[in-house]
């Protein structure tokens, strides 16, 4: 066992306690292992921006349910959410919503992504960033 196995064991124990009558558990032996290596979800951060705090809360929930992969869809026709030093207009122009200006200008800096990856890593979760090219690139072309 590694630390992730310990974390998963503690999550199983907490889940049992939460559902046990009067928080009492019988003496038991648990044999638990995942059926699949990839246990994750995908968030469309391009069309529906998630703040760093919202992502951290999601990562906490993922860890509780023993998920190990978060696929972040960072670019699409509607917005480019990935800051790139060489192309600053991608987040300046590529995040503008003409129909919903209050959603405009939101993106992830390099520091944001480092923070998210580090936070996820401490919970045994891998981040898969997705840049949707060559299709779905209207936001990129606008910038």
Please report, for each region that a protein language model flagged, where it lies by residue:
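Feature activates predominantly on carbohydrate-active enzymes
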Residues: 1-143
